[in-house]
C-alpha cells in the first residue's frame, strides 16, 4: 500500500510537471507567434532588419558582435577622444545594423520585437506624439524597479500623468531661478577641497579625479532643493543608490533575454541577493527621512518637492487603511528614489564630460572665464547674471550633444500607434540612440564628431538641419521634468570651476565611456588643475 501511494504521488507530480510545461509551451508559442506578427506588420511597411532565429531572435548575433568588439578594444587620446564614436563599442550591434539597414530597422530579442528609429522625421513625429499610448518599455522598467520604483520616470498612462502634475511645478523656470544661490553654496565645499589638495601638494598643479566630488555636490543640491535636507543626511542613500546602479547594470538590463520564464511566469526578478538587500535598505532609509520630515513639519506649510509628493500621495491613495498605507508609502518612496537618482547622477556625469572636453580645449576655458567675470560679481553667478552666460550655455549644449548622459529615448507602443506614415504595432519597443542622432553628419554637418560649441551660438534652432534631433533631455510628453533645473545647475557648476581653475587632461586619464544606465567615464575624469 505504501509503495502504491509513493508511485501515485510520483505519477501525479509528473502529470503536474507535464501540464505546466505544456501550458507554458502553449503560452510561449502564442507569444512567439505574436512577435512574428509584429515583425510582419513592420516589414510590410518597408522596415527591414536582420533575420531572427526562431526562439532567441537576434540575441546570438548581438552577443557575437559584442564579443568581437570587446576583443578589439582600443585606447583613445587627444583629438581622437572627441572624435571617438563610442556607440560602436557600447552598442555595436545597433551600429552594425544601422550601417546595413539604415536609420530605421527592426530586430528581435526573442520574446520582444524592437524598432530602431534614428530618422529625424520620425524622431520629430515621436516628439509631437501627444498620446498616453507611447509609454516606457515595460520589461526595462520592471528590471529597474529596484532603483526607480514606479515613480514618474518609469510609470505609464494615467498613473504617470498624475505624478507628473504633482511634481512638475517644482521645476518651473521661476522656481529654478530662485535656486541658483543654493547650487553655489553646495559647490563651495568641493572648490575649497580642491584648493586644499593643491596646498597639501605644495605645487601650483594637482591631479584631481573629479567624479565623486561632483556627485557629492550635485547630491547636496538635490537634497536641499527638493527635500529640505543636506547631503550629509542623504549621504548613505546616494551611496547605496550608486552601488545598486552598478549591480543592476552588471545584469545587462536593456537587452538580456529571459525568454521562456519571462513569458510563463512574468519578467523574473534579477535573482540577485545583493540587489534585493540594497533595495530594501534604500527604501528603509528614504522612509526614515520621510517620517522625520513629517515629524519636523507638523503645522509647517513649507512647499518644497518633498511636501508636494507627500500631499500628492495622500490625495491619490484609495482603498482600506492597510492598502492606503502601503500605497502612500510606495508613492512617496518610488518618487523619492527616482528624483534622488536622476536628480544628481545625470548632472554629475554631464559636468564630468564637460570638464574633460574643456581640458582638451583651453581656449574655451578662457572664453568662459572672461564671460563669468564680465557678468558675475566675484565670479559667482546669481539669478540675474546666469541668463547672460551665453558661452557657458553653448559649451554645455555641445557637451550634451557629444556625451548625453542618457543613451536612449525608449518607448513601447501600448496600442497600435501611427508615427508619420509608419504604424507601430502594439507591443513593439522603440529605441532612438541619442549619441548616434547627435553625431549624424547629415544632421550636424561635416564636423559632427568635433567639439564646436559655436554651432549653438544662435540657439538650438540654428545649430543643425533638424533641431528636433537635439534630445539630451528626451522628447515629447516625457521630456525630462528637471530640464530647466539641470541646465541651471550645470551652468553654475561649470562657471564656478572654470573661473577658479584652469586645467588640462592628466596623462593618467583613460578614455573609456561605459553604459551604467547612463553613459559615464568608466575610470573617472582626471584633470591636471592649475589655480587661477
UniProtKB/Swiss-Prot annotation:
Classification via PROSITE patterns: CYTOCHROME_P450
GO molecular function: heme binding; iron ion binding; monooxygenase activity; oxidoreductase activity, acting on paired donors, with incorporation or reduction of molecular oxygen
Loss of function: phenotype: No visible phenotype; due to the redundancy with CYP714A2. Cyp714a1 and cyp714a2 double mutants flower earlier and have an increased plant size and biomass.
Lumenal side: 1-4
Subcellular locations according to the entry: Endoplasmic reticulum membrane
Binding sites annotated in the UniProt record for heme: 480
Required cofactor(s): heme
Keyword set, alphabetical order: Endoplasmic reticulum, Heme, Iron, Membrane, Metal-binding, Monooxygenase, Oxidoreductase, Signal-anchor, Transmembrane, Transmembrane helix
Transmembrane portions of the chain: 5-25
Tissue and organ distribution: Expressed in the shoot apical meristem (SAM), petioles of young leaves and emerging leaves, in sepals, stigma, anther and filaments of the developing flowers, and in the receptacle and stigma of the developing siliques.
Principal subcellular localization: endoplasmic reticulum
Protein origin, superkingdom: Eukaryota
Cytoplasmic side: 26-532
Record membrane topology: Single-pass type III membrane protein
EC number, UniProt record: 1.14.-.-
Pfam family, one: p450
Keyword Oxidoreductase found: yes
Record-level GO cellular component terms: endoplasmic reticulum membrane
Coiled coil (UniProt feature): none
InterPro entries tied to this protein: Cyt_P450, Cyt_P450_CS, Cyt_P450_E_grp-I, Cyt_P450_sf, Cytochrome_P450_Monooxygen
Family from the record: Belongs to the cytochrome P450 family.
Protein task: Involved in the inactivation of early gibberellin (GA) intermediates.
Miscellaneous comment: Overexpression of CYP714A1 causes severe dwarfism with defective leaf development.
Protein name in UniProt: Cytochrome P450 714A1
The organism of origin for this protein: Arabidopsis thaliana
Amino acid at each position: 500500500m505504501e509503495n502504491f501511494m509513493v508511485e501515485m504521488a510520483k505519477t501525479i507530480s509528473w502529470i503536474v510537471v507535464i501540464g505546466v510545461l505544456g501550458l507554458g509551451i502553449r503560452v510561449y508559442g502564442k507569444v512567439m507567434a505574436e512577435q512574428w506578427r509584429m515583425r510582419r506588420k513592420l516589414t510590410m511597411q518597408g522596415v527591414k532588419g536582420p533575420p531572427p532565429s526562431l526562439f532567441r531572435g537576434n540575441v546570438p548575433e548581438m552577443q557575437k558582435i559584442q564579443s568581437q568588439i570587446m576583443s578589439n578594444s582600443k585606447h583613445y587620446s587627444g583629438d581622437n577622444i572627441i572624435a571617438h564614436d563610442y556607440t560602436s563599442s557600447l552598442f555595436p550591434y545597433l551600429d552594425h545594423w544601422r550601417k546595413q539597414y539604415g536609420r530605421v530597422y527592426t530586430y528581435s530579442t526573442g520574446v520582444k520585437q524592437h524598432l530602431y528609429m534614428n530618422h529625424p522625421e520620425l524622431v520629430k513625429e515621436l516628439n509631437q506624439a501627444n498620446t498616453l499610448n507611447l509609454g516606457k518599455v515595460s520589461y526595462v522598467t520592471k528590471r529597474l524597479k529596484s532603483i526607480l520604483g514606479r515613480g514618474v520616470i518609469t510609470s505609464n498612462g494615467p498613473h504617470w500623468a498624475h505624478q507628473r502634475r504633482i511634481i512638475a511645478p517644482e521645476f518651473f523656470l521661476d522656481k529654478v531661478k530662485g535656486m541658483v544661490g543654493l547650487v553655489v553654496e553646495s559647490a563651495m565645499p568641493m572648490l575649497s577641497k580642491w584648493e586644499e589638495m593643491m596646498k597639501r601638494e605644495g605645487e601650483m598643479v594637482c591631479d584631481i579625479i573629479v567624479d565623486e566630488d561632483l556627485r557629492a555636490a550635485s547630491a547636496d543640491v538635490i537634497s536641499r532643493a527638493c527635500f529640505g535636507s543636506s547631503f550629509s543626511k542623504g549621504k548613505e542613500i546616494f551611496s547605496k543608490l550608486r552601488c545598486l546602479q552598478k549591480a543592476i547594470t552588471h545584469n545587462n538590463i536593456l537587452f538580456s533575454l529571459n525568454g521562456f520564464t519571462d513569458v510563463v511566469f512574468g519578467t523574473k526578478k534579477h535573482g540577485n541577493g545583493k540587489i534585493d538587500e540594497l533595495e530594501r535598505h534604500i527604501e528603509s532609509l528614504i522612509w526614515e527621512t520621510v517620517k522625520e520630515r513629517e515629524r519636523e513639519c507638523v503645522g509647517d506649510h513649507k512647499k518644497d518637492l518633498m511636501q508636494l509628493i507627500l500631499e500628492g500621495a495622500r490625495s491619490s491613495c484609495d482603498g482600506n487603511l492597510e492598502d492606503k498605507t502601503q500605497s502612500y508609502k510606495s508613492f512617496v518612496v518610488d518618487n523619492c528614489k527616482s528624483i534622488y537618482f536622476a536628480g544628481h547622477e545625470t548632472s554629475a556625469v554631464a559636468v564630468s564630460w564637460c570638464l574633460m572636453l574643456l581640458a582638451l580645449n583651453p581656449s574655451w576655458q578662457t572664453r568662459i572665464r572672461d564671460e563669468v567675470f564680465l557678468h558675475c560679481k566675484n565670479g559667482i553667478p546669481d539669478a540675474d547674471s546666469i541668463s547672460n552666460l551665453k558661452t557657458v550655455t553653448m559649451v554645455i549644449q555641445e557637451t550634451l550633444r557629444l556625451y548625453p548622459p542618457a543613451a536612449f529615448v525608449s518607448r513601447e507602443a501600448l496600442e497600435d500607434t501611427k508615427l508619420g506614415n509608419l504604424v507601430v504595432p502594439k507591443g513593439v519597443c522603440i529605441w532612438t540612440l541619442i549619441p548616434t542622432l547627435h553625431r549624424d553628419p547629415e544632421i550636424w554637418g561635416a564636423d559632427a564628431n568635433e567639439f564646436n560649441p559655436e554651432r549653438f551660438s544662435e540657439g538650438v534652432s540654428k545649430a543643425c538641419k533638424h533641431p528636433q534631433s537635439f534630445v539630451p533631455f528626451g522628447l515629447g510628453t516625457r521630456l525630462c521634468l528637471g530640464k530647466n533645473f539641470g541646465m541651471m545647475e550645470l551652468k553654475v557648476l561649470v562657471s564656478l570651476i572654470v573661473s577658479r581653475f584652469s586645467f588640462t587632461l592628466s596623462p593618467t586619464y583613460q578614455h573609456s565611456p561605459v553604459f551604467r544606465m547612463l553613459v559615464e567615464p568608466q575610470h573617472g575624469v582626471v584633470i591636471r588643475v592649475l589655480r587661477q
